[in-house]
């Protein structure tokens, strides 16, 4: 039947997701709290913390310090909708995960995917850099829903 063949193809797609990515087969909203951070490193600025010397400026994402050239991985499957230089963010890649959810990856050394490309959970999409004026190599990482910034640590697990 058509329903069982659709179910089989959905199961095949889910089985192609790396086992280390438990949220791979889930819709983005259902994967909340189950996705890994896109890079291993030390969180140097958290969502909502003061940015620079101005108390009015707050971080709308995370800044994760990591070695130059470290691979940055997609936290969930999606389509690349932006992959270019953006003032203040350096080399920035944005993934659209559907239903208004975006993940943003900035200050990269290199971008490994182009606009229009579909990526799988865990796929390497960029490498850590300090483009856009950072003093040390770090990844800017943010999640947005319909334009609203969300706390990435509510969506991603800190790896042990």
Outline where the language-model segments fall.
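A generic structural motif
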Residues: 59, 67-69, 90, 100, ...
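Extracytoplasmic/periplasmic cell wall- or extracellular glycan-interacting regions that localize
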Residues: 1-89, 94, 144, 149-160
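Conserved, short, structured surface segments that act as functional micro-motifs
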Residues: 93, 115-160
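Conserved positions in beta-strands of structured domains
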Residues: 44, 79-81, 109, 126-129
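Short histidine-centered loop motifs in beta-beta connectors
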Residues: 83, 98-118, 122
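Short beta-alpha junctions and helix-cap segments that line functional grooves
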Residues: 28-30, 107-108, 129, 138-139
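Detector for Asparagine
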Residues: 11-13, 99, 108, 130
């Amino acid at each position: 039947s058509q329903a069982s063949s659709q179910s089989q193809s959905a199961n095949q797609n889910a089985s192609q997701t790396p086992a280390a990515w438990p949220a791979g087969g889930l819709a983005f909203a259902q994967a909340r709290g189950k996705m890994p951070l896109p890079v291993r490193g030390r969180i140097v600025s958290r969502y909502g913390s003061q940015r620079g010397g101005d108390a009015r400026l707050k971080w709308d994402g995370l800044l994760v310090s990591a070695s130059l050239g470290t691979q940055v991985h997609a936290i969930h499957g999606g389509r690349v909708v932006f992959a270019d230089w953006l003032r203040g963010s350096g080399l920035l890649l944005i993934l659209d995960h559907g239903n208004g959810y975006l993940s943003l990856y900035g200050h990269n050394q290199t971008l490994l995917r182009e606009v229009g490309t579909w990526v799988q959970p865990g796929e390497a999409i960029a490498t850590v850099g300090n483009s856009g004026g950072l003093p040390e190599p770090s990844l800017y990482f943010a999640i947005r829903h319909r334009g609203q910034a969300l706390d990435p640590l509510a969506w991603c697990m800190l790896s042990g």
